[in-house]
Design a protein with these regions (language model features):
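Boundary regions of SH3-family modules and the immediately adjacent low-complexity/disordered segments
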Residues: 74, 150-151, 156-193, 200-207, ...
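Conserved beta-strand/loop element in small beta-rich adapter and peptidoglycan-binding domains
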Residues: 207-223
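Membrane-embedded alpha-helical segments of integral membrane proteins
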Residues: 107, 112-151
Length: 247
């Protein structure tokens, strides 16, 4: 597993009130120091405290996953690696550690293969949603600046530039729409319980269809009365208690 603790400029990457900035920075430094000194449980507790207070950062989730994998808690480790992947999708070390963690699980269930839409828009997942929004903002600004210049200087170069940037702007908005579709329609859960029985209905007395173990990745298809319906493939589907799963 790749060993990497990010001593952070996390604060620059998150939108948090300035009045809390110093507190967050101190807590990050404390958590990183605890991890560096092999106090993994205390480090994990500090990172979890930051998350509970609204701190949302891919590098923090990555470090939290590393702390849990050191503690042998593969379920929480995989859960936080997946959270990190949504925010820092191009981090190669993150993908290596996620693959390593999955190999430590009993079920060894990998992430589902991309569907047709994901294959067609393969480049969309290379950026986080925030990055797509920021990119669209920059392209939109460039378009209006170019359009303004074209009104004053109607040259062929500015006309072609305007049309090209307009096309890129449309592409940026399409990318945001596709990314939102991916995030709203693909709900992945991670089993946190050591073992959980997948039932045929919303009650513990129902038939056990199969069992899952800590760290198993599942697709959540429904939620009712404290239970969630999970699916592995077209044949393996059933209900488990919601509190046995991390989302």
């Amino acid at each position: 597993m790749i060993k990497k603790v990010l001593i952070s400029l996390f604060i620059l990457l998150c939108h948090i009130p300035l009045v809390h900035a110093e507190d967050f920075m101190n807590e990050i430094a404390r958590a990183n120091d605890l991890y560096a000194s092999n106090n993994y449980q205390q480090a994990a507790d500090s990172y979890e405290s930051l998350r509970d207070r609204g701190f949302n950062n891919g590098h923090m989730y990555y470090n939290l996953g590393n702390a849990y994998i050191r503690l042998g808690k593969t379920g929480p480790a995989i859960l936080n690696y997946i959270r990190a992947k949504k925010l820092i999708p191009r981090d190669e070390n993150l993908q290596v550690n996620l693959n390593f963690a999955i190999q430590q699980t009993r079920d060894k269930i990998t992430q589902p293969p991309p569907d047709t839409l994901a294959i067609l828009f393969f480049w969309v997942n290379d950026l986080s949603l925030n990055e797509h929004i920021n990119l669209a903002f920059v392209v939109n600004l460039a378009f209006w600046l170019t359009l303004t210049a074209w009104f004053y200087f109607r040259t062929d170069f500015l006309r072609l530039t305007r049309n090209l940037i307009f096309f890129l702007l449309l592409l940026a908005f399409v990318a945001i729409s596709v990314k939102l579709h991916f995030e709203s329609n693909s709900k992945t859960g991670v089993v946190l319980a050591k073992t959980v029985s997948v039932k045929s209905g919303l009650d513990a007395s129902n038939i056990t269809l199969f069992e899952l173990h800590e760290g198993a990745l599942v697709n959540i298809t429904d939620e009712r009365q404290g239970w969630v319906e999970v699916q592995l493939d077209s044949k393996q589907k059933g209900w488990i208690p919601k509190d046995s799963l991390g989302i």
